[in-house]
Amino acid sequence: QRNTEYIEQTHAVSLIEKVVNGHRKRPLVLTADRGRGKSSALGIACAQLLQHKPLRILLTAPSINAVEPVYQHAQRLLTDAKQMKKDRLEVGYGYIQFIAPDELLSSLPECDLLLVDEAAAIPVPMLKQITEHYHRLVFSSTIHGYEGCGRGFTLKFIEWLQQQRPGMKTYHMQQPIRWSVDDKLETWLYDAFILNAELSPQSIEGMANVSLNKVDKQALVHQPNLLRECFALLVNAHYQTSPNDLLHLLRDDNSSVYLAMDKQNIIGVILTVEEGGLDDELIEAVQLGQRRPKGHLTPITIINQLGLVKVGKLITSRVMRIAVHPDLQGSGIGKRMLTLLEESVGAHVDYLSTSFGATDELIQFWQQAGYQSIRLGTMRDAASGCYSLLMVRQLANKSQTWIDDTQALFHEFLSASLSLVYPKLEPSLARSLLRQPIQHQTLHPTKRVLLQSYAQGGASYESIFVWLQQWLRQHGLGPVSDLMISKVFLNHDWGICAKQFGLSGRKQVEQQLRSELEKLLSQFTV
């Protein structure tokens, strides 16, 4: 590696090693364009560290496929390494172990070094939790291409990290390894697939001039600058935006593109797909699990998982993507775009829907736009690490009574199934989804007396937790702590709760629960 083309990579390797050998709480943020040797730098650093001592190295990323090059480069240099499984490489008593972000935060395993690859694709709240629990950390991310940084990582997280960890280091790798310097083929590839789509700075004077226009997709092909700006917004906002999305965007007759404009400037984009309108025969086949027609995610889920067969005949416009220029995020433009979309969809559309990887921020955004949760997927998405949430919205001129009924059933199902189906759900997500009180439920007076007794040191947790769960759901989980949700709804073990919240054991956990319950009982008098 004496060649000059490896100078930056060699420096990156030394910075990674310094995270282990230097002071604690001085994380490294490593960024690079595609083909700059970022993943190989991680692998080389792991190998060189393991050659000197048996370290416990944990590697997390949105999916294990994203970190395969790290293992390959480490194994190339470690001749005595044993690949135990796809996710584990052992060298003597040391190892490199992959762990999914959600599992990392639920089990909090000890390690000597934690590498967080493609960090931009991991929700910012999870990155903050990782920072608080682990003190020898490397965050790495691509900043161009479809794995590229969203502004949430580059702005929100890195700014927060600089405040929390003043000794942090950042290093950006620019030197090409996969390509020659100024390689014409790389330039062509980036242009062809809009891999380097950049956004120009934007500002607006107010909402009055914001409009939403459905665009002719063929016109996009003939206006490359318009297409580039539209796609730049999508790449910036969504980690999973890929070349296939570009083709889908241009070819699919059922999908539509809406551009939010302020005067002549593009400030946002919405992609929708029309679904539903299924016939009786197909609906029955979907209900029985015999058919799953492509392009009908919302009606298939509602028919097969929720049992509402008649909804399959209705037409929905599902929002696949919504992106707002990062300079303008948080100013209400996204909500305004969704309001304008309701006015723009065809008269034949019966309701709106959306499905996305659930985070607190996104749930709050869609709830504020009037969308209601009706189904939470049972498996985390491999790329985002999030559960998929299906939400629907009534149109002003088309009442859909089934939506309120379905949301009530969703709340009932979720609160009863959290510990069985979603034991690793983040407590904050449970709070976001079960925030609304159940007005028609009241607690039997005897149950309340028991809760009062427990709050003051009597009864036992095992004798009251069912009534506690009922009472908390009655009032909604808005004011309920993460600890209370973890124990009462997710049924986490006492030891896990203690470890997660920095307490010594069951006794301290119960003290916290009793104290919080006493405050909540005085806050809610029924």
Functional labels for PLM-detected ranges:
Residues 23-29, 55, 255-256:
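Pre-Walker A (Motif I) flank of P-loop NTPase domains
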Residues 40-44, 321-344:
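Conserved acetyl-CoA-binding loop-helix of GNAT-fold acetyltransferases
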Residues 8, 33, 62:
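P-loop (Walker A) phosphate-binding loop of NTP-binding proteins
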Residues 55-71:
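Conserved RecA-like ASCE P-loop NTPase motor core of nucleic-acid helicases/translocases
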Residues 1-3, 75, 81-94, 99-107, ...:
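Terminal substrate-recognition subdomain of acyl/acetyltransferases
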Residues 27-40:
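Walker A/P-loop nucleotide-binding motif
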Residues 254-272, 280:
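Conserved beta-hairpin
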Residues 2-26:
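N-terminal pre-P-loop "Q-motif" helix
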